Structure formats: C-alpha cells, structure tokens
Amino acid sequence: LLLDTLKASAPARVVVVPSKIHYRAKGINFDVLQQQTTSVGQLKEYGVAKLANVLFAKELARRVAGTGITTYALHPGVVATDVWRAVPRPFDALIKKFMMSEEQGAATTLHCATSAEAGAQSGLYYDKCKPQTPSAVSQDEALAAKLWAASEAWVVG
C-alpha cells in the first residue's frame, strides 16, 4: 500500500522489528494462520509471527532492489518495558536487572534507520547494531514468497 510513496521518497528505509524468538519457529502453517485461536501456545505463535516479520523484510528487500528502498529486520534486545507488567513480584524486579533500558533497546532500530553503514545494505537481520545470521527457515526464499502471496490475497479479500 505504501510502496509507491516509498519509491517516490527514495532513499527510504523500512525497519521491521521481529526478535530472536523467530529462531524457535520451525515454519509457518498457512492452514491455521487465519483461524481464531485461544491456544496456550502463545509463545510458539509469537515466534511464528516474528518469523513472518523476518521473511517479510527479506522478501520486501528482494522486491524493491534497485529502487532506493532498503529493508532491515532486527532484534531490539530484551528491554525493560511495560510488556513485562504481568510478571509477578518479586520476579519482575529480578528479571528487570538483566534487561536493557528503553534507550539501549532503541539503539539497533536507530542504527538501521539512520546509519550510513546500514544504508548501504538491504534485507539483513541485525542484533546489537551488527548484521547477524537469522534462522535457517527465515532464509527460505520460497517460504517468503508464499507468505507474501498469501498476505496479498488476505488483504485483497
């Protein structure tokens, strides 16, 4: 929906924020993607959603190559935000000692959005402001293309 605007605004960057949890996803079951779920496997589903984010960034990079649009997927880190508000006391204080601040968590996103170094590359996965190797399944070009086609079909209706 925004591709024409991004192309007209080039150079432009698209920063997608999945997380390391995508490494846990083994693939995408397209038969259940549009079904409503109340499953207890929320972490598994979250991993699949984050895998889809990485695949999207990679497929978008392929589709816009040479247009002045660059794409990035990244792991922001485990950040001490309100997302952890449901963790019971005293565990909340304990785990927050091992988390990074919101400012630290923004570093990789800002790096991908603004740095000259990142601007020269597209379709990469970043962690701690450096390109990293994403999961093997997230590098499956056929799966990325299938997800793109399915997503377009769902949006069109």
Question: At which residue positions do the language-model features occur?
Answer:
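Hydrophobic core positions within the conserved protein kinase catalytic domain
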Residues: 2-3, 109
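Non-catalytic terminal and boundary segments that flank Rossmann-like NAD(P)-dependent oxidoreductase
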Residues: 11, 23, 27, 137, ...
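Residues that form generic nucleotide/phosphate-binding pockets
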Residues: 33, 97, 150, 154
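Short C-terminal domain-edge/linker segments immediately following a structured domain
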Residues: 43-51, 62, 102-106, 141-142, ...
